[in-house]
């Protein structure tokens, strides 16, 4: 029998390849997150707490109540996010998945913008501000101008991109010209945008007449994103725009010369500078493009879903986009999947609340998923995946 060659010794086994893959890590991250969330569901459930007071007398009541609480909570999450099999019609049943995709659309677009900065080594925290100014610009063009249908929609979307790009470009200029920390500048720009929006909604140019709450007029029908599946579903053309934006991110960062420069600056700014790449110019362009994409997300949100501007138009999209971009490893496919996941937890959380589960628990589930996915070594150790990556002991090593 021939002795094992070095090539055979270095060839990883199937188990080792599984252990090194990211897919099992993501799966186990969800498993651990939902297991810990199940414990929190039990603690928050009144029936479980009551049955626990006589656990040793009638343990079956406790286990039955625990099972019912967990199953009903996650069943409600599934029905609220994916498919409501208890609905009377198929339209109502599938509307939950369509609603999840609708909620995910602006979130994914904003996360794609965040990913541009992350891939280039810039930590953009200004998603909220860029989203707000993009929404405001698109809304103003939508209700303030009278244009032909297609031109009106394109103009409103372009205004959102331009405004978001301008807002991100301010931070990029400060970074390029004065080496100002982008984390600090984008956070400050967030607060400026929030207060700017609050002021705009008090002006005659933005505030709708005869309304009690600060709100703009509704955008005109010619500027609204058309719905893709009829009036019974809210999914609109923004979903297609989101897919095109993901394709643009892939092309920009993987196939274009500009994207290569961005990645080079992100990997090693000094080496990029020596190679003749202007780090300052790259930083400015990165923030310009990132802000434009986030502004597009704001425009899609106001033109496709909200149809009017209010002081809560950004919601938590700006900060959730940071998490989605990190969760998706700043890649187009990963961001789309992570965005749908976050949107599903949001839409399904409303159903969970009807089962007596606190709505804040949904945020806890999101945080747990992010926590575990952001720490692959922890997940591998907890799940035993790290044992699969240990090198094999060959026959020669055993004899030695």
Spans of model-derived segments:
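Short loop segments and helix-boundary regions at transmembrane helix junctions
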Residues: 15-24, 118-126, 147-214, 218, ...
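Interfacial/capping segments of alpha-helical transmembrane domains
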Residues: 38-82, 206-215
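Cytosolic-side transmembrane-helix boundaries in multi-pass membrane proteins
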Residues: 1-33, 38-46, 267, 274-281, ...
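Transmembrane alpha-helical segments in multi-pass inner-membrane proteins
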Residues: 288-367
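Single transmembrane alpha-helix segments in multi-pass membrane proteins
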Residues: 40-46, 71-145, 157, 161-183, ...
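Hydrophobic core segments of alpha-helical transmembrane domains in multi-pass membrane transport
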Residues: 26-42, 107-114, 135-141, 161-164, ...
């Amino acid at each position: 029998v021939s002795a094992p060659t070095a090539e055979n010794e270095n060839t990883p086994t199937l188990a080792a390849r599984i252990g090194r893959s990211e897919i099992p890590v993501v799966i186990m991250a969800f498993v651990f997150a939902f297991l810990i969330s199940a414990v929190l569901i039990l603690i928050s459930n009144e029936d479980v707490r009551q049955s626990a007071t006589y656990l040793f007398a009638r343990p079956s009541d406790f286990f039955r109540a625990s099972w019912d609480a967990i199953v009903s909570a996650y069943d409600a999450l599934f029905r609220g996010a994916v498919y409501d099999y208890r609905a009377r019609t198929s339209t109502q049943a599938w509307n939950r998945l369509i609603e999840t995709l609708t909620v995910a659309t602006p979130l994914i677009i904003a996360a794609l913008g965040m990913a541009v900065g992350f891939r280039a080594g810039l930590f953009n925290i200004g998603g909220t501000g860029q989203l707000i100014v993009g929404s405001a610009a698109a809304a103003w063009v939508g209700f303030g101008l009278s244009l032909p249908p297609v031109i009106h929609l394109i103009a409103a979307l372009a205004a959102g991109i331009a405004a978001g790009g301008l807002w991100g470009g301010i931070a990029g200029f400060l970074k390029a010209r004065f080496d100002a920390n982008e984390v600090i500048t984008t956070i400050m720009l967030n607060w400026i945008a929030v207060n700017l929006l609050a002021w705009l909604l008090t002006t005659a140019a933005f505030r709708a007449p005869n309304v009690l709450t600060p709100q703009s007029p509704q955008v005109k029908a010619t500027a609204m994103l058309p719905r893709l599946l009829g009036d019974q579903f809210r999914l609109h053309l923004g979903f297609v725009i989101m897919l095109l934006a993901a394709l643009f991110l892939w092309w920009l960062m993987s196939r274009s010369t500009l994207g290569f420069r961005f990645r080079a600056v992100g990997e090693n700014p000094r080496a990029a500078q020596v190679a003749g790449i202007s780090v300052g110019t790259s930083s400015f362009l990165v923030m310009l493009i990132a802000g434009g994409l986030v502004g597009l997300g704001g425009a899609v949100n106001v033109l496709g879903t909200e149809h009017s501007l209010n002081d809560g138009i950004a919601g938590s999209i700006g900060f959730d986009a940071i998490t989605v971009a990190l969760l998706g490893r700043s890649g187009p496919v990963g961001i789309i999947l992570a965005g749908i996941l976050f949107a599903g937890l949001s839409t399904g959380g409303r159903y969970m609340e009807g089962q007596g589960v606190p709505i804040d628990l949904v945020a806890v589930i999101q945080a747990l998923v992010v926590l575990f996915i952001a720490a692959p070594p922890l997940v591998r150790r907890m799940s035993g995946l790290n044992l699969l990556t240990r090198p094999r002991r060959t026959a020669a090593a055993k004899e030695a």
